């Protein structure tokens, strides 16, 4: 049985942003398993660098939806049929589609004025980054930031066909096993470079990791 999981950047982003394609699988994995969690210091840095831009992209998706509403034929009081049509015709597959569908499903009453709807949508756009920050704080409270000292040059060479950013995470996760003695798996949303084409078997053959687990939602 696995004692610990080492997370790549995509898993952290997937958990913290519910509009991320992999959010629900990442959330289930992190909240329903009781093992120790680790991320590397460079994963933390990469996450913090990307968080504001991703939040802005999602907020822009909500603002685009507001613009569509303002330029539509809807006006005055909307009923449940109107809001159902809005969900079907105006939400689309933009960067905020998950948040928007959840908003219409759970926060919009059967009757609502268009102005009130737009007001609430603006509030939703402002909350995107704060929600991600709160999720990140929850995650970091459960996670140990790991700094590797050993370069493991022989393993690094054996994994050389794997891109460096992914290879580095493999070495970081291997270091946890070496230093802590915990049965550890690597969790990723990037199966192309860490699971597919024999990469999983290569990693398990060259490192002390128990498994490489893909949380990716594939199309």
Question: Which role fits each region the language model picked out?
Answer:
Residues 1-39, 46-82, 95:
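Short, well-structured N-terminal submotif of metal-dependent ribonuclease cores
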Residues 4, 158, 162-163, 170, ...:
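Acidic, PIN/NYN-like endoribonuclease modules and their adjacent C-terminal/linker elements
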Residues 52, 64, 89-102, 200-219:
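Long hydrophobic alpha-helices with heptad-repeat/coiled-coil character
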Residues 76-85, 131, 209-219:
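Repeat-unit-sized solenoid/scaffold elements
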Residues 86-185, 189:
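Active-site neighborhoods of divalent-metal-dependent phosphate/nucleic-acid chemistry enzymes
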């Amino acid at each position: 049985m696995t004692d610990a999981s080492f997370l790549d950047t995509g898993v952290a982003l997937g958990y913290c942003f519910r509009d991320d394609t992999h959010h629900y699988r990442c959330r289930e994995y992190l909240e329903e398993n009781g093992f120790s969690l680790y991320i590397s210091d460079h994963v933390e840095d990469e996450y913090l660098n990307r968080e504001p831009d991703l939040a802005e992209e999602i907020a822009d998706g909500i603002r685009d939806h507001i613009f569509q509403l303002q330029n539509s034929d809807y006006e005055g009081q909307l009923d449940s049929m109107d809001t159902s049509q809005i969900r079907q015709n105006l939400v689309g597959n933009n960067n905020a589609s998950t948040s928007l569908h959840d908003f219409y499903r759970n926060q919009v009453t059967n009757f609502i004025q268009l102005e009130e709807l737009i007001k609430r949508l603006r509030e939703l756009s402002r909350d995107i980054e704060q929600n991600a920050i709160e999720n990140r704080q929850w995650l970091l409270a459960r996670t140990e930031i790991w700094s590797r000292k050993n370069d493991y040059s022989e393993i690094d060479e054996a994994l050389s066909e794997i891109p460096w950013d992914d290879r580095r995470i493999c070495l970081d996760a291997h270091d946890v096993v070496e230093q802590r003695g915990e049965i550890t798996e690597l969790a990723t949303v990037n199966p192309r470079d860490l699971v597919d084409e024999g990469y999983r078997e290569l990693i398990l053959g060259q490192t002390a990791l128990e498994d490489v687990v893909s949380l990716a939602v594939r199309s």
